Amino acid sequence: ISFEVEKGEFIAIMGASGSGKTTLLNCISTLDKVSSGKIYMEGDDITRLKGNQLNRFRREKLGFIFQEFNLLDTLTAFENIALALSIQNVPAVEITKRVHAMAEELDIESVLSKYPYEMSGGQKQRVACARAMVTDPGLVLADEPTGALDSRSARMLLESFQTLNREMQATILMVTHDAFTASYAGRVIFIKDGKLFHELRKGNASRREFFDQIMDVVTLLGGDLNHAI
């Protein structure tokens, strides 16, 4: 597989179960090692990073959003978001400023003092999104981020992704098997049997028009993919 991601792009990676999309994400995140080939980010081959260099790369350059939120139950929403900055030794005043700015962007100011068990699934995922974005990473990796959400919460999260992409120039790489979710991206890469199958760009199309284009490819691709509008 060979493709490029430009700074500020919002890309969805689609494919049936077992197609290799999550493995691809794991390789880009350096959680899995590649057996061959190279992965470049900002001019550096990240497959060659080891030890402290690798830890620093993950901490400073990547943001992660998972299907199951992965929030710490003993911390409030504010503390969960702030943790990523505390690890980087950001001053407390700056942490407070950045957490509140991100919370305002994602409309979660009202839950900052709440613990995960006090929040809805959609709120928890937006807190997780804020945690991933607050460090201003070079790349945000999202693995099935809407998988545990109802349709309303999923739509709100995806609209938040679009806002962050547009206003903060956030670079987002999102794995999904859902055409509705993918239709919020600006580009969709389709993978089949570990290989690049097709690629679509949204251009000036509406979200619904792009959804229809995605569904045309899904029909050709086959496999276990969702068809919700």
For each predicted feature, which ranges?
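Conserved beta-strand-loop-alpha-helix hinge in the C-terminal portion
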Residues: 195-220
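ABC family nucleotide-binding domain
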Residues: 1-187, 191
